[in-house]
Amino acid sequence: MVKLFIAQLYDRRDYVKTMLIVAEENRLQDKVREMGYNYCTAQEISEIDGYEIEVRPKIN
């Protein structure tokens, strides 16, 4: 089974721009840097039926 991780990506205004799903957690930080974002949270998910792109303020 392949583990999937979902990350919320934030721009400099701290708004969520998109969600990135990757198969390996250790690729996450590099991907986020490549895309020019400065913050992310990763969460393992066991299955995905679908996901929506959200734009909302970051909650601390």
Predicted region positions:
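Short aromatic-glycine-(Arg/Gly/Cys) micro-motifs in beta-strand/loop hairpins
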Residues: 1-15
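Short amphipathic alpha-helical segments that mediate assembly, nucleic-acid/protein binding
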Residues: 2, 25-28
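Short, mixed-charge low-complexity intrinsically disordered segments
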Residues: 16-17, 34-60
